[in-house]
Amino acid sequence: MVVQFGPMPPPPHAKKTLVLSYAGCGTCKKALRWLGDHDVEVEVRPIVESPPTAEELSAWVPRSGRPLRKWLNTSGLSYRALDKERLGAAKDEEILRWLTQDGKLVKRPVVVMGKHVLVGFDEKAYAEVFG
């Protein structure tokens, strides 16, 4: 039998969780409210002023389990302004460049906690990560 003395290890979300958010986004507000209600300490980064970098996306996309194209905010004005023919033919490199140049093109919020990256707000997924 192993007996542990001393302080309990911190919960999995003890480090600050990075949330890329847009103040006018209802989904972001819901996600931030949920995180607050579950005592998750967050660092909010405004996604429009500070969109994700290519390096961040290269690390986060595989951890999210979503293909890069699913990171596009298809309901926003920036997306609607894209040339649909060009969008259909776009390679990942071009989509990556768009996402780094226009934060409104990124589906939000983006929540980064350790090895977990969540895109959008899905209460069940948040509960699995943050308990």
Model-based region annotation:
Residues M1-P7:
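N-terminal amphipathic/basic-hydrophobic helices that include classical n-h-c signal peptides
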Residues G6, A31-R33, K70, L82-D83:
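Short, flexible segments with low predicted structural confidence
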Residues P9-H38, V42-R45:
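Local sequence-structure signature of Cys/Sec-based thiol-disulfide redox active-site neighborhoods
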Residues I47-G131:
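Thiol/selenol-based redox catalytic cores and closely related redox-interacting motifs
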